[in-house]
Amino acid sequence: MSEGNIEPHGGRLISRLYSGDASGMEKAAISQELASDVENIADGIFSPLEGFLGRNDFEAVLEKGRLADGTAWTIPIVFDADAAEAARIKAAGDVLLEDPSGSKVAVLHAEEEYPFDKKAAAARVYGTDDAAHPGVSRMLSMKERLVGGRIDLVDRPEKTEIRRLRMSPVETRHAFAESGWKTTVAFQTRNPPHVAHEMLQKTSITTRDGVFVNPIVGRKKPGDFADEVIVKCYEEMIKHYYPENRCRLGTLHTEMRYAGPREAIHHGIMRQNYGCTHIIIGRDHAGVGKYYDPFAAHRIFDDYPDLGITPIFFPAFFYCRKCLTYTNPKACPHGEGEREQISGTALRDLIRAGKAPSEYILRPEVARIILEHPRPFID
């Protein structure tokens, strides 16, 4: 791998834009989450995918965590429909996809439609078929058929406060090059920055050029932080605590799957497509509850030596009152009683009570944004 010019996953950055006339086509409605992923396919964030998975690729992803041709891919990107709708779309061939507002999204070139076992598929992707798992629950609620085929993007959503920070891989690669970065570390997040996260990011760029903070914007589980809160907190943190030209912020518009180890690989692939040479993989990356071993997302990278991006594995960071620094269990001999750390539940309880946590947990500027927001959490 050439760190200064990392290849997209699969060797080619996909770009699929529609230049024809879509008027008069059959139409099909898709969710906002699926509309976001269609845009991700079109822009190459999901390279090498050019559309929704066909049956051979879908089954290969479930069984092997790879596409049918052997290319690493761990999360199925699919379009579900009921039997009648799937048959109609397949018969039409080219179908105009519309989001819930009726806006044009893309043309789907439908190639096949096929059934799938939702419970078995969920067990493969999530390592469990427990309906209490948010990803499993989502898959079990899907319709019974899948439609495979390439897509071509017709139109994009209007710019919003959140979308102003969305960037395509072409844009991020240009931005990194313009900054003079040859090594770029990706930081995946679905939370506002704890000071420990900030220190972890800064540790990772001590010997690298810059960090790309890339929060997930899209559907998450109840109790997670709202998208606008996460973005505003990061903007404030970068403004006050980062040297110039060492950190860039860009939003990734997709939903959290909570697929643990498989999603860690997916996160790495997307960030490689953005042009990142490294990705931070923390404890229980993309996990939820107690479904995954805390370091399973580290070990899974052993099964994917062909990825171009390099994972940086970190245990949990915390502030130690004895060490007088931010550290981790590998470097600190002191017990839990000396550590400034807080669980997600305890942090949410504090915020709901209108109280700010210790400055060793959240920067004052970050805490203020959260406390002043009328609805910092997803209902």
Curated annotation (Swiss-Prot):
Protein name, UniProt field: Sulfate adenylyltransferase
Reaction(s) catalysed by this chain's protein: sulfate + ATP + H(+) = adenosine 5'-phosphosulfate + diphosphate
Entries under InterPro entries matching the protein: ATP-Sase_PUA-like_dom, PUA-like_sf, Rossmann-like_a/b/a_fold, SO4_adenylyltransferase_pro, Sulfurylase_cat_dom, Sulphate_adenylyltransferase
Annotated pathway: Sulfur metabolism; hydrogen sulfide biosynthesis; sulfite from sulfate: step 1/3
Name of the gene: sat
UniProt-listed Pfam families: ATP-sulfurylase (PF01747), PUA_2 (PF14306)
Species classification: Archaea, Nitrososphaerota, Candidatus Cenarchaeales, Candidatus Cenarchaeaceae, Candidatus Cenarchaeum
EC number of this enzyme: 2.7.7.4
PANTHER family assigned to the protein according to its UniProt record, in alphabetical order: PTHR43509, SULFATE ADENYLYLTRANSFERASE
Biological process according to GO: hydrogen sulfide biosynthetic process; sulfate assimilation
Family of the protein in this entry: Belongs to the sulfate adenylyltransferase family.
Keywords of this entry: ATP-binding, Nucleotide-binding, Nucleotidyltransferase, Transferase
Gene3D superfamilies xref list: HUPs (3.40.50.620), Sulfate adenylyltransferase (3.10.400.10)
Lineage top rank: taxon: Archaea
GO molecular function, one term: ATP binding
Protein's organism: Cenarchaeum symbiosum (strain A)
